Amino acid sequence: MMSDDMLDENDENFACQDVDEIIIYVPEFAGYREVNIDTAVSVCPTPIQQARRESSCRNLEMRRRFEKLRREKKEEKKLLADDEKDFDEDDDVFEDGEGLQMRTFQPNASIRDENGSMPSLLPRTAPIKKTRKHRRRRSGSFTGGVYPRKGHRNRSLLGHAIPPPNVHSADWRDMLAITDNKDDKLMKTLGVTRYLQSKGGDQVPPTSTTTGGAGGDGNAVPTTSQAQAQTFNSGRQTTGMSSGDRLNEDVSATANSAQLVLPTPLFNQMRFTESNMSLNRHNWVRETFTRRECSRFIASSRDLHKCGCGRTRDAHRNIPELTSEFLRQKRSVAALEQQRSISNVNDDINTQNMYTKRGANEKWSLRKHTVSLATNAFGQVEFQGGPHPYKAQYVRVNFDTEPAYIMSLFEHVWQISPPRLIITVHGGTSNFDLQPKLARVFRKGLLKAASTTGAWIITSGCDTGVVKHVAAALEGAQSAQRNKIVCIGIAPWGLLKKREDFIGQDKTVPYYPSSSKGRFTGLNNRHSYFLLVDNGTVGRYGAEVILRKRLEMYISQKQKIFGGTRSVPVVCVVLEGGSCTIRSVLDYVTNVPRVPVVVCDGSGRAADLLAFAHQNVTEDGLLPDDIRRQVLLLVETTFGCSEAAAHRLLHELTVCAQHKNLLTIFRLGEQGEHDVDHAILTALLKGQNLSAADQLALALAWNRVDIARSDVFAMGHEWPQAALHNAMMEALIHDRVDFVRLLLEQGINMQKFLTISRLDELYNTDKGPPNTLFYIVRDVVRVRQGYRFKLPDIGLVIEKLMGNSYQCSYTTSEFRDKYKQRMKRVKHAQKKAMGVFSSRPSRTGSGIASRQSTEGMGGVGGGSSVAGVFGNSFGNQDPPLDPHVNRSALSGSRALSNHILWRSAFRGNFPANPMRPPNLGDSRDCGSEFDEELSLTSASDGSQTEPDFRYPYSELMIWAVLTKRQDMAMCMWQHGEEAMAKALVACRLYKSLATEAAEDYLEVEICEELKKYAEEFRILSLELLDHCYHVDDAQTLQLLTYELSNWSNETCLALAVIVNNKHFLAHPCCQILLADLWHGGLRMRTHSNIKVVLGLICPPFIQMLEFKTREELLNQPQTAAEHQNDMNYSSSSSSSSSSSSSSSSSDSSSFEDDDDENNAHNHDQKRTRKTSQGSAQSLNITSLFHSRRRKAKKNEKCDRETDASACEAGNRQIQNGGLTAEYGTFGESNGVSPPPPYMRANSRSRYNNRSDMSKTSSVIFGSDPNLSKLQKSNITSTDRPNPMEQFQGTRKIKMRRRFYEFYSAPISTFWSWTISFILFITFFTYTLLVKTPPRPTVIEYILIAYVAAFGLEQVRKIIMSDAKPFYEKIRTYVCSFWNCVTILAIIFYIVGFFMRCFGSVAYGRVILACDSVLWTMKLLDYMSVHPKLGPYVTMAGKMIQNMSYIIVMLVVTLLSFGLARQSITYPDETWHWILVRNIFLKPYFMLYGEVYADEIDTCGDEAWDQHLENGGPVILGNGTTGLSCVPGYWIPPLLMTFFLLIANILLMSMLIAIFNHIFDATDEMSQQIWLFQRYKQVMEYESTPFLPPPLTPLYHGVLILQFVRTRLSCSKSQERNPMFDFSLKLFLDNDQIEKLHDFEEDCMEDLARQKLNEKNTSNEQRILRADIRTDQILNRLIDLQAKESMGRDVINDVESRLASVEKAQNEILECVRALLNQNNAPTAIGRCFSPSPDPLVETANGTPGPLLLKLPGTDPILEEKDHDSGENSNSLPPGRIRRNRTATICGGYVSEERNMMLLSPKPSDVSGIPQQRLMSVTSMDPLPLPLAKLSTMSIRRRHEEYTSITDSIAIRHPERRIRNNRSNSSEHDESAVDSEGGGNVTSSPRKRSTRDLRMTPSSQVEESTSRDQIFEIDHPEHEEDEAQADCELTDVITEEEDEEEDDEEDDSHERHHIHPRRKSSRQNRQPSHTLETDLSEGEEVDPLDVLKMKELPIIHQILNEEEQAGAPHSTPVIASPSSSRADLTSQKCSDV
């Protein structure tokens, strides 16, 4: 150990942050030397090392190690010098000897120094270990050495070491080193020790250390053996190490761990209460996150007053303060470490060198000269400048902050919901403009992608470049939608403007917009959260890059969707961008895990280059050579970089393009209606190589059904059943209605899917909207700790909500037993599976178990270890909740706003609470994981052969209604059977839920929302009924009356009554049915009441009435008791019958023939509204006198002639255990459907009694083979009857049956009871009017008998009601007002009669007199049956109900006035009850006008009367006068005035107004109300016996006997007693029910189609479509305006370029003149340069005159000569002319006026002859022009919707032309023919269009044209520059033109391969075409092409003149394409 006296006080000891490194000075003989702590551990050993080396010689060991360190340090300094040299050369190489060792030293490597000798450097373990560690870099690199950067000697830097172009290389190197060291040291802190593998085998650790997590939850870090395996698997093994090296490495690891700051536990807000929650959040942020500050001023080499960190010297004045803060932080950490017994920290650290300069040559380093301190900037920023400030959260963090802490900050401190997708946007950092349409599409797509998927958008956060376009997308969203979108900005702290304003803890910073000029930038105001990343520098990029990468990689690897096992996907979106963007894309596509990238083509720069490279890269991953050259030049031009940098960028582009599966190019308009959002999501699906199930899961998590429909299910995969079931479960839980519909379209079997466990799980999920289910469950069952919803409890809730004695199937004993068995099996399977999945915790809502990560312990950056050690905030655990929610949950508040959160708050280990909501527990495991296993087990055991639920859609609809999922409930209503019943039940449930919500005083909108949902289902039920009625009325009547076994055995008609759906029951279909039921077997059209009364009075009159036929009576609903009796009687009668089979066969054959004819007749008829013989008018209601129909003998034989076959078949069916049915109700036997009713009634014999009819109608046709043929016809009562049935319909019933049908009709029962009641009232009135004798008379006994019988009937109704509990029976009975009146009347009469008999007669008489009021009111009950009186009775009842509120107010007013009046007027009274009467008596009568004028003011009246009598003055209050004046006598008259104003005028007027309103409202609905009440009347008198009181007890006695017999005969286990079911139903078998369901489903489809058509043709939809089309037209006009503006700019630019070209041409002409004058050119040549107005001038010696250019508008004489010259050379093939039909928006326009010249700005002379201009000699190369203009203006459009910078690149396909979605870029091959070899074909950058311009020389030149040669000039070196054309083409070539071009290419190719001399001669004879000829055909010529072609005639003219002058002239030289401008000029000069 080094002592303090060994160090000098002047020595500088520097200590940087512990996490990075510690540098100390070690004395060595004459001085000190600086070493790293990794190599100085032997000098400063830890206590462990000290104990191991006590016996050794310390001094000797120290000296030996110092010698070794000296040699190593010497070599390191040498290498450092080389590294610094490389760094100065801008080569990014890591320094050796620092924390990150990038150099690899192999033990056997041959490393020699400069002299060739072996250095003394020995292999060291620590550097080797670190080098291996950093080879396994998992992020920030493109692995595999795709583009290695060469380092020093044997070192090479991979992609992760290469900094982005805008990041300082040293900063990048240091930041990577710091982050890597921090990850490594965290592993050591967590107890992970490296045991390196030796040559002989693995080194086994002596002990196994386990470190527990700080969260206290028992999660432990893997043991060292596990860490060892992970270390070996990660590729960090080190071989060839000695034991001493291992020891040093272990000691070094221990020393490093001693200096490590232990990570702060993840924030868990459940640990804190509400009072200190905010404070603890702030403390946690301050303790967890750090900032980085510069600790020493080291002057920069460029500016001595500025530090290497970028700040000035004055900004470093706070270094002493930072030092103190740093020391305080270290001491606190040391104390913490000492408490944890990790190691001791040396606090005696000299920090004076933190702000002093060590040496003159020292360079500033981020690792050495920065320290990490606690963050001092976090809070809220308010962006000003808008209508209201936008608020955002921000925090300043260090660049090496762990992503786990950041995620904890997001989810728990800032309360951000976990992401389901990460969209990271990259692009240009400087401002740029997008094309208008592309900008609109990008904004719309990004907003849709973020809002629909729950994504997080991550940007740089700076208010420049691509971030502005992201902000524009968010601006288009609504405020509510924008608040849900999470946009996170990761911005560099050092580049932030006014960053000093952000410094403060929990500070609110007002932020005002500022200019974006300068190096620093501001924050964008559309972001919600900001991470201000700090690396200690100012004005530099790079800090945010590292943190952003680490955060994105952490999310993609460790963050899970919905807490399951699927990681959150990350996608990159590229918009424009520079070289840094290309580097980022390269990292994304080459890192692990891969990140898909979406590139927006047409946005500019990097995006366009990436899109072009992706499209044109070949299969071998390279670009074609010709395209590569053009792209290389375009890269140089676009980015303004050097050639080497351009090559590097091009290589990176190529590498990116090789990953085609990861790159998705979005091209506007290419994919139809698909926008950017579709491209983003499809890129994720195709870029991650996911299975179909995983793709479906992602689409489901994003809630993008369009992606699933177009990209997942469109591939034709064979989907396993389990995958579809899991997806359906997820869709149901998360309320994904569209996905449910999509999965149903894929053919999922819902009966197999929906099991008891899954339904139980659905009720217990905590996802979905808030609902009131828990509150209602708490009312019906006792809720305890850890309660979970159970299906039997849900059944109780349904029964409570439905009311009216509704019985749910969940509460039956059969279902309860089944539920218990299933739950036991689930628990058993779960326990059994725990042995296999013990390491997998339970899931909470994702449907997939969460598995613990088995990856290596990579530190906090890895994520899994942090979740296991420091808390459960990540992975599969639910996030903690806000304390407000917990408090509301504990207090039992019934507020609904946080109901779901309330239930979720109790899912963890929280204190017990008696009001605790349900806990999910392991429900997901039970439901979705073990269902298949349970089904297999059940199938193997044979215990389950049918699905758990017959109608799964009905069960799911109830679940959706109870959990308030309206869209899901609507979806389930549209699917499945019994749609009408489902709509009615949903309406009732919603109404009851709304009532419960109103009673609980929940939010008003919740109640109103539930009422709205109920109204929607009510309307749907009515629409469905109306549609079915118009399709087929007969089947609709059956739908209303058949028994619904799944809905408490009710009917749709009964459900409508329960729902109180007045409009439903008022429908004509229901009224027809009720009218038929009311009349029973009677057929009466007019005066039915009079006829029935006459029949009751005179029974013989019954025979004169009209009745229904026998067949019509068979098709009527019946009660359950009648149905049971019919089956029993039919069984007994059929068993005693016998007949021959021959007659049966004959009868059956005849029936079959008739049926076949009937079916053939009806087969082709369309479905219309049919009116069959079994319509509603033929239905009948039977009474409760069951025995009256069942008096036939049981042993009566069947008629042999008619019913032999029926009896025989019935006997066989009874023997097989079958059942029978009657009246349209058939039993089910072996799945064979019985025949229709009319066949059962077919008989040729006459029935002598009704037992014959009953026998025949109740026989079942089941087993006879002849009858089975009849059953195949499937004819029901709704089909058109055959002729036999029509013949049978005329048969009438017998006399005895007439009496029975008359007395059993409800109308007859009603009149019998009414007449009886009238007689009772008459006798009762008589007894009250006469004197009451002491003894009761006969009339009184009759009356008491009547009342007693009436009371017994009421008791029977109560007992036989459907409700099971007795109190429920009483409650149901009392709900009726008339029942209450009846009970009170009966009780008072019995009390009064007994008082009259056994007590005081007078008092008894009084009681009876009062009771007469109630009996008289009972008359209104009978009157309500009348269609006119009934509505008025309803109105009166409603008025009385509403009048009660006014009466209460009136009583208060009476009391206030009456009490004051009584007390003042009569002050001396003693107490008596009459005083209370006086308070109300007279004031009440004052309301009706009786004001008691004499008693108003008695004192004043007497004084006035005395005044009138005596004539004296008016004296008041004088005692001598004897006046009765009391104190305050004047007050009562004053009070009475106000009383009459309020009571008599105000309240009475209000009461009258209310009555008027009630009358008006009721009058409108009076008919509906009466029709609704009519059902109750029909059902009441149907269940009432015909015998009225006092004869009713006779019926009761018979009923008791039947009940006893039924109980004795029925089994004890039978729950349903048919005697208590009086509802009228049709009992159908399964086949008939299936037919009804088919009919209902067909009507549902027709109704849905009709509603869809109505919606599409509605005015709203038309207006919407018109609005959309108007927007499209407006956007198109905007695009056209933009194109027009762009065209103007291009034209202006072309004009300016032409002016510059003309200027250059004049200069060239001057040069040519000078050259010719120097060479003593002939006089003719000299005359050439003097422009002459005469174009045809010859010299005296015959030499040609000036060479002229023939342009449009020149002299017609020349045109004729040119024409003649062209005719002479017709034999030669014409030149290739390419005519592109293009629409240009830029320059190149040529006027057609004759006096307009193309290139000369000078006007023509006075004579009108245009002036001639000489041609230029040199090529008009566009390179001298500004490159910026060329890159922006020279664009040829390949796409109709947008332009790209790559449009100027010419694409050449040698073999075939590839036509893609863009506009065709034609290739033009120009020939460069050499005099000595063949021609070679080159690719022109422009579209192939040969513009051959012909010169117009003088006459001498024309004569010698045959000797002239034409030279073609091409410049491949400047190919890319020429490619940047200045016209934008918007048309494409046609197919015909394309074929012509191909032919021309073939001809040109053949010409190019001709012999050179032959070709040369052919070229001499080749005619030249004039420019006028080309332009005359309407072709638009590019001015650059014109200028280039002008070079040819000048060269030709010069050569001719040379030849004529006798100069030696060799073979014509043809300018090669590779010739540059200098070469061409020199060649021309030499020729001259």
From Swiss-Prot:
Q: What is this protein called?
A: Transient receptor potential channel
Tell me which species this is from.
Caenorhabditis elegans
Q: In which tissues is it expressed?
A: Gonads.
Q: Where is the composition biased (Polar residues)?
A: 839-855, 935-945, 1120-1129, 1171-1185, 2016-2032
List, as start-end ranges, the regions of compositional bias called Acidic residues.
1935-1947
Cellular component aspect of the GO annotation: plasma membrane
Q: Is Ribonucleoprotein one of the keywords? A: no
Give the span(s) annotated as Disordered.
Answer: 129-162, 197-223, 831-860, 912-945, 1120-1211, 1753-1779, 1853-1909, 1935-1982, 1999-2032
Biological role stated in the UniProt entry: Required for initiation and continuation of postembryonic mitotic cell divisions of gonadal cells Z1 and Z4. Zygotic expression is necessary for hermaphrodite fertility. May be a cation channel.
* Taxonomic path: Eukaryota, Metazoa, Ecdysozoa, Nematoda, Chromadorea
What kind of membrane protein is this, topologically? Multi-pass membrane protein
Biological process GO annotation list? defecation; gonad development; metal ion transport; mitotic cell cycle; monoatomic cation transmembrane transport; monoatomic cation transport
> What residue spans carry the Basic residues bias annotation?
129-139, 1951-1962
Q: Which family does it belong to?
A: Belongs to the transient receptor (TC 1.A.4) family. LTrpC subfamily.
Q: Which UniProt keywords apply?
A: Ion channel, Ion transport, Membrane, Transmembrane, Transmembrane helix, Transport
Q: Where are the transmembrane segments?
A: 1310-1330, 1332-1352, 1374-1394, 1439-1459, 1535-1555
Q: What is the effect of changing residue 955 to K?
A: In allele gon-2(q388); gonadless phenotype
**Record localization:** Membrane
Low complexity: bias regions = 1130-1149
Q: List the Gene Ontology MF annotations in alphabetical order.
A: monoatomic cation channel activity; monoatomic cation transmembrane transporter activity
